[in-house]
Amino acid sequence: MSLSNSLGLLGRKVGMMRLFTDDGDAVPVTVVDVSDNRVTQVKTQENDGYVALQVTFGARKASRVSKPEAGHLAKAGVQAGEIIQEFRVSADTAAQYQAGASVAITSVFSVGQKVDVQGTSIGKGYAGTIKRHNMRSQRASHGNSRSHNVPGSIGMAQDPGRVFPGKRMTGHLGDATRTTQNLDLIRIDEARQLLLIKGAIPGSKGGFVTVRPAVRSQAAKGAN
């Protein structure tokens, strides 16, 4: 489900590059492939209790599709995609689409607007407190022996006699759903169906992402 009642697009992170402005400034951008977003189901208040558009992206082999999902997609006349996601939308927006229809980039986004990008962050495996929580190392010398990159004390003694829940400690880092908000959409390549978004987005190359209009766009610095 989307974070807001607005339609977005599913895509794949291609990688990063840079563009140059007319003044010669380099702008780092992430390229996102949002080609062939298609509607698999239109959910209505009368039939489903809420209004939403179910969208799929990519292509998947028929042998990799479960029978219930295959029947659902066959009813809509849509090829099986790699991911399926719902977007809560208004009734007016839902009325513009029907199952099997493609979602055009320009019908959702325009150059210069703010967008939110959601993806799965790169997995780092088991990490220590310094890398995982950005803690500071202990002293390199002056009496410190073999305790340079350890977290130190994690609690007290007999009272309370336990480690409080939520204590920041070592553990698995990354491979989690993360959202980067208020990124500038620098350019739209309609021919190749690409979005060029300023800055970095979660995930590795080839990872799936969701791009939607910004939920809470910030005003420019210095604006009254």
Curated annotation (Swiss-Prot):
Q: Which Gene3D superfamilies match?
A: 3.30.160.810, Translation factors
Please provide, alphabetically and separated by semicolons, the GO molecular function terms listed in this UniProt record. Answer: rRNA binding; structural constituent of ribosome
Per the record, where are the segments of Polar residues compositional bias? 137-150
**InterPro entries according to UniProt:** Ribosomal_uL3, Ribosomal_uL3_bac/org-type, Ribosomal_uL3_CS, Transl_B-barrel_sf
Which residue stretches belong to region Disordered?
134-159
Please name the SUPFAM superfamilies in this protein's record.
Translation proteins
Modified residues annotated as N5-methylglutamine in this record: Q158
Pfam families recorded: Ribosomal_L3
Q: Which GO terms describe its biological process?
A: translation
Taxonomy, superkingdom: Bacteria
Please report the PTM annotation for this entry: Methylated by PrmB.
Database matches in HAMAP family: Ribosomal_uL3_B
**Subunit text:** Part of the 50S ribosomal subunit. Forms a cluster with proteins L14 and L19.
Q: Name the job this protein performs.
A: One of the primary rRNA binding proteins, it binds directly near the 3'-end of the 23S rRNA, where it nucleates assembly of the 50S subunit.
**Similarity comment text for this entry:** Belongs to the universal ribosomal protein uL3 family.
- Write the protein's name: Large ribosomal subunit protein uL3
**This protein's encoding gene:** rplC
